[in-house]
Swiss-Prot record:
It is an enzyme of class 4 (lyase). Its cofactor is Mg(2+); pyridoxal 5'-phosphate. Substrate binds at V279, D280, V281, G282, G283, G284, L285, G286, I287, D288, Y289. It comes from the Bacteria. It catalyses: L-arginine + H(+) = agmatine + CO2. The modification N6-(pyridoxal phosphate)lysine is found at K99. Its EC number is 4.1.1.19. Catalyzes the biosynthesis of agmatine from arginine. This is Biosynthetic arginine decarboxylase.
Length: 628
């Protein structure tokens, strides 16, 4: 491609549309990261090289904690602007639900941004124990999820220790436990109630909101809870109203509709006498993983300002209309805070090129399928391309059937494939996406005629949402972007599972079934970046084939450059085997017995013993040495 340029690289991989200013391409063709507005752009390949020099191996998760602070600041600024525009005096708190990424480096970095404008959310006892320590004195803690007596007691202890804990009632039975424990500890509880909205935000996570939601009270249950609480000494403790419209809401109209309904609950509960001081709108703020700026499930058609305005405006109008004190607005936008800050870097271990196809020499005893395919190939420049491909598909299938029935041998079977792929390449060269009738065939050919890039990582461990819910993540080679990619490829991982593949790729502000990639150069590592993986992926990842956590580094960027602030070694084989119940001493003893029984020379026995020990204590992933 003679017209290739850095701008063409940016466009091909849709970088300006999903990167939100944090990632770009420099003149050397490297992906660069700019975590802070006034900081330098740092070469991602150089960061990876420095991490490897310090002992890290690929696959490698690279975290930029400065981006976390930037994301939080942008969210707070958007609500400050919206509240100013709507003359709203209630204030705003950005709560981080640590389920999104509980790692200390993530939750701790966000929690270090002290102030009334930040809080934490827990959905389980272990998470609660973490946030009780992470929270600033007097900090806001929202306690969600299913609760037993111990969970409630711990939350109330937090209240007694000066933290602003709110226990959100999500099941009617929880209120009785809260009242009993509050009296036992002699502490006034901070209570919230989660409502089930009828409004439903469309998307992959839509059942986290609406009538089918796992959590929350119905209108009748909300009324019954208030009637029960009203007759106790804690009637003025119901201070937080919580609801959830969904996660990764793509369409801003869904947010507006949900807020319209939720505001009615705020007005009605206030009219009944509840002292609602906080309205927690939950999560929902999406990320444009695709860069398509659309209502697609992995995209969004709005920005931060629009999101904030659609939350502030209904509450501002309701408070003015009904003479109510504006409540503090709380959001739980963990995805928006964390997604951008982490990038997974993995090396290509091998490439299986798509069949090129060739025309074999003719033979007198050729089966009918081969003769027909040869005739089609001879007419590639004469007859309509789509018609030729359809005929080729028919005779290719006929040949496969004949082989399965034992009517032709392996040599003929191979020649059938050779001819079919030669035809496929010839047909693709004649088709154009500008012709509507060509598009279905082009789509099929682009899926067939692609290389397989086997990448040293596990889909199930590092990007599990790709497998679980067909989530889309931007994927970009982190170097050589000043060169035109010569191939199209799909990415397969190292697991022994056919689901360990990426099937959808971000390209040219759209989605495709393959990705432009480069030919590998002998002696060079070809490294690919998986972007926007900072939310949920680490926590949801599993250990399929016993591939464990990857190595990880935290990179801090300032005006003088960057430094690797923290390095964490990934899981080793012995750790994974111990996790699934293997006794390491027994394994070592068994290896030793088998070496002894093999009657090897002392030198060879020592060599094999050392190799087995290295395998047992080594990284669970493949070597990251360059190919060739």
């Amino acid at each position: 491609m003679s017209d290739w340029s850095l701008d063409q690289a940016r466009k091909t991989y849709s970088i300006p549309h999903w990167a939100d200013g944090y990632f770009d391409v420099n003149a050397a063709g490297h992906v660069v990261v700019t975590p802070t507005a006034d900081g330098p752009a740092v070469s991602l390949p150089e960061v990876v090289d420095a991490a490897r020099a310090a002992g890290a191996k690929l696959p490698l998760l690279v975290r930029f904690p400065d981006i976390l602070g930037q994301r939080l600041g942008k969210l707070q600024a958007a609500f400050a602007q919206a509240q100013s525009e709507w003359d709203y005096a209630g204030g705003y708190t950005a709560v981080y639900p640590i389920k999104v990424n509980q790692h200390r480096g993530v939750a701790g970095t966000l929690a270090s941004h002290h102030g009334e404008g930040f809080g934490l959310e827990a959905g389980s006892k272990p998470e609660l124990m973490a946030v009780l320590a992470l929270s600033r004195p007097g900090g806001l803690i929202v306690c969600n999820g299913y609760k037993d007596r111990e969970y409630i007691r711990l939350a109330l202890i937090g209240r007694k220790l000066g933290l602003q804990t709110f226990i959100v009632i999500e099941k009617p039975s929880e209120l009785t436990l809260v009242l009993e424990e509050a009296r036992a500890l002699d502490v006034k509880p901070g209570l919230g109630v989660r409502m089930r909205l009828a409004s439903l935000g469309a998307g992959k996570w839509q059942n986290s909101g609406g009538d089918k939601a796992k959590f929350g009270l119905s209108p009748r249950q909300v009324l019954d809870l208030w009637k029960t609480l009203r007759d106790t000494e804690y009637a003025d403790s119901l201070n937080l109203l919580h609801f959830h419209m969904g996660s990764q809401i793509s369409n801003v109209r869904d947010i507006a509709n949900g807020m319209r309904e939720a505001t009615r609950y705020f007005v009605e509960l206030s009219r009944l006498g509840a002292k609602i001081s906080h309205v927690d709108v939950g999560g929902g703020l999406g990320i444009d993983y695709e860069g398509t700026r659309s209502r697609s499930y992995c995209s969004i058609n709005y920005g931060l300002h629009s999101y904030a305005s659609n939350i502030v405006q209904p509450l501002a109008s309701a408070c003015e209309e009904h003479g109510l004190t504006p409540p503090r607005i709380v959001t739980e936008c963990g995805r928006a805070m964390t997604a951008h800050h982490a990038v997974l870097i993995a090396n290509v271990s091998e490439v299986e090129q798509a069949p090129e196809g060739r025309v074999p020499d003719a033979h007198d005893d050729e089966p009918a399928a081969i003769r027909h395919l040869r005739e089609i190939h001879d007419e590639l420049d004469v007859r309509p391309a789509v018609e030729l491909f359809q005929e080729a598909q028919h005779f290719h299938a006929e040949g496969l059937s004949a082989y399965a029935l034992g009517q032709i041998d392996l040599t003929h079977r191979a020649r059938i494939d050779d001819l079919f792929y030669a035809i496929a390449h010839g047909v693709r060269a004649r088709l154009s996406f500008d012709e509507k009738s060509h598009r279905p065939v082009l789509d099929e050919l682009n899926e067939r005629l692609v290389d397989k890039y086997f990448v040293n990582f596990s889909v199930f461990e590092s990007i599990p949402d790709v497998w679980a819910i067909d989530q889309v993540f931007p994927i970009v080679p982190i170097e050589r972007l000043n060169e035109a990619p010569q191939r199209r490829g799909i990415i397969a991982d190292m697991t022994c599972d056919s689901d360990g593949m990426v099937k959808t790729y971000v390209e040219n502000e759209s989605l495709d079934s393959s990705l432009p990639l480069h030919r590998l150069n002998a002696g060079e590592s070809y490294r690919i970046g998986f972007f926007l993986v900072g939310a949920y992926q680490e926590i949801l990842g599993d250990i399929h084939n016993l591939f464990g956590d990857t190595d990880a580094v935290e990179v801090v960027v300032d005006r003088d450059g960057y430094r690797i602030a923290q390095q964490r070694r990934g899981d080793t084989t012995d750790v994974m085997l111990d996790y699934v119940g293997y006794q390491l001493d027994t394994l070592r003893a068994t290896y030793a017995e088998r070496i002894a029984a093999a009657h090897l020379s002392p030198e060879r026995a020592q060599e094999l013993s050392a190799a087995l020990e290295a395998g047992l204590t080594g990284y669970t992933y493949l070597s990251d040495e360059p190919l060739g």
